[in-house]
Amino acid sequence: MAEKAMNKEFEELFQKLIARPLGMKSSHFTPVNTDGGHAPMLGGGLCTTLHDYMRFLDMIYHNGVFEEKQILKPETIHEMQADQVGNAEVHPGEYVERALKKYHTGIYGLGEWRELIDEATGEAYQISSPGWAGAYPWINKQDRVYGFFIAHVQGSSQKEDGFSSFYGSPVISQTVSNIISLKR
């Protein structure tokens, strides 16, 4: 949709509107097929560094602002984190229930899992965007913390002993929040 609206390739838009303003010098999207002429792989195709991605998380955490510069509008951030599935049927065992032992139907925003929800407002206070290969970026607005856990998993994310980096990563954000709570 962005390519059609702006009449530009996705990578060009990403670089101009997100990467360069955030100083993400080592970030780009890989194409689905590297033979040339293929669209970028938006799900799991970002090649980046921890330094670059933390700049992106910092901007999201600060409501679209990075180093006193508005990169994304606050309304855009709000829409990204809003419930995008409404009253859709959420089957037992979906990511939020399986990974966090929480159940709610508003599990997905735009490119973000709505992991933890304020029951009074319906607003997500913890969002994430985990990858099957072990990447787990998260933001917890209630505990005022965000981070990025990276583990490279070869082959299937699900191991013989039942461990899955995709489903296991949220333990890290919960542990960080618990430690912060003890320090306050």
Where are these regions (language model features)?
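Active-site Gly/Thr loop motif
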Residues: 25-51, 82-146
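Alpha-helical scaffold elements that line and support the substrate/ligand-binding pocket
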Residues: 1-18, 52-63, 143-148
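A penicillin-recognizing enzyme superfamily signal
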Residues: 70-74, 78-79, 90
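Extracytoplasmic/secreted envelope proteins and their assembly/folding machinery
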Residues: 11, 15, 50, 54-57, ...
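Short, well-structured active-site flanking segments
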Residues: 5-30, 69-74
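Second-shell loop/turn segments in exported
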Residues: 1-4, 41-44, 66-67
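Short, gly/Ser/Thr-rich active-site loops of penicillin-recognizing serine hydrolases
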Residues: 85-95, 117, 156-184
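Short, well-ordered beta-strand elements
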Residues: 144-157, 161
